[in-house]
Amino acid sequence: MMMNSFFPAMALMVLVGCSTPSPVQKAQRVKVDPLRSLNMEALCKDQAAKRYNTGEQKIDVTAFEQFQGSYEMRGYTFRKEQFVCSFDADGHFLHLSMR
């Protein structure tokens, strides 16, 4: 009786070990319209200036990252306070996070 269940289980383990590894998935890179990214940067600077009670000229945006359904801009104030602006896939401002 034990032999009847042993062979199918053993065959299953052998077949599982023979499967090929799944291909590595990579994020798709879509070229962002320069005008859109400049508008997003201006909006990010405006929101950060309001949050930190300073002028836009004292805000630096240092990084722009694109994710599957959103964008993030990282930056800091002249006092070295870091923040992240988040945007949806269409470039609409979502929120500003202080870091």
From Swiss-Prot:
Compartments, record wording: Cell membrane
Lipid-linked residues (N-palmitoyl cysteine): 18
UniProt signal peptide: 1-17
InterPro entries attached to this UniProt entry: YsaB-like
Membrane topology (UniProt): Lipid-anchor
CC per GO annotation: plasma membrane
S-diacylglycerol cysteine lipid modification positions: 18
Location, primary (coarse class): membrane
Keywords for this protein: Cell membrane, Lipoprotein, Membrane, Palmitate, Signal
Pfam family, one: YsaB
Protein name listed in UniProt: Uncharacterized lipoprotein YsaB
Organism from which the protein derives: Shigella dysenteriae serotype 1 (strain Sd197)
